[in-house]
Structures are given as structure tokens and as C-alpha cells.
Amino acid sequence: MENNKKKLILLDLDNTLICAEDLDTVKDKKRLSQAQKQFRTVRMEDYYDIFERPHLQEFLDYLFKNFKVGVWTASSKDYAIFVIKNFITAPQNKVKPDRKIEIFLCSHHCNVSKKYFKGISKDLKLVTDQWKIIDLSQVKLVDDLEKLANHQPENVIHVKPFFYDEPNSKNDTELLKVQKTLETFK
């Protein structure tokens, strides 16, 4: 499939692809230590431990093969770049796979969206109507915020939020479900 004909998938980061634990507020250090053994974890300086959602790399391989991929997160720019570099474009310090982020939107862009679109932090009309980057029928947002899915039901794929410390989180298959859903969008 030619890259210029591929549709666009925008990915949220926190609780969609990864889960971050603020190291200053950890209450159960034993549980954190156990989770570090169960999940691929990357420490961002002494601020956060960031946990990879199960099946993330398989999911990303599928996305980059079949779609243009972008990120739209409510997180700060620096934090988002750290997550992208460590989990999306160069995972596990391996040779960088052929993964290029087509569009990168962060907290600033969420604020712009709220300004233009009645308080909705990730209204896709910002990229389709306001900036005219892509047609609305050619884009999907994968996000854990149900509010976004309710606002844009045709364009948002809602995922169950990922928390590393929830029971059975190691067996999470949410990204595989999204992959199956996207088969009909290609």
C-alpha cells in the first residue's frame, strides 16, 4: 500500500499505549517492583516509571505497515517525545524499526482544540477542518477517554484504560482488539 494513500491513525499515550507511575507518589513499592518484572519498563529520569501495555510492539508493527501513524496526547511535549522515542520509534533499544510519526500533537494542541471546539480536548476537526491535514473519513483516534468516543463515535476507537497495577493487567489484549477493528478501516 502506498504511504500517501494510507489512512491516519492517531494514538493517545497515557493509559492507551503505556501507563506511567509518578515515583514521588508511589504508595506500594513492593507492587511497583513486581510490576517492573512483569512489564517492559523505562524510567524517565527520577520522575516516572513507564510501563508498556501488553502487545504494544505487535500492534505498532501492524499500524506502521498499514497506516500513517501519529500521536495526539494531552501530555507535555518533553514527556511525549520521551515516550515516543522509547516505546514507539526505537523500542527496547533495538535497531530502529521503520517507524515514522507523521503528525505529533501534545498538550498545547489539546488547548487549541478546546478553544475552537467547545471544550473538547482532541476534536479531530482541528486536523481535518481547521488545518486541513486530512479528510475526517481518513482518520481514527485510539484513546482511553470515553468522552472523546462519545463526541466523535465514527472516528474514535475507545480502549479500556491500561493500569499496570490492576489485577490481570499482564493478560491485557485491548490492543489486539483494536488491531482487529482496524482491519475494516484499511
Curated annotation (Swiss-Prot):
Disulfide bonds: none annotated. It holds the Pfam family NIF. GO terms for molecular function: phosphoprotein phosphatase activity. Residues 2-182 form the FCP1 homology domain. Gene3D superfamilies: HAD superfamily/HAD-like. Keywords: Hydrolase, Protein phosphatase. It is an enzyme of class 3 (hydrolase). The keyword S-adenosyl-L-methionine does not apply. Its EC number is 3.1.3.-. PANTHER family: DULLARD PROTEIN PHOSPHATASE. Belongs to the IIV-6 355R family. May function as a phosphatase. This is Putative CTD phosphatase-like protein 355R. It comes from Invertebrate iridescent virus 3.
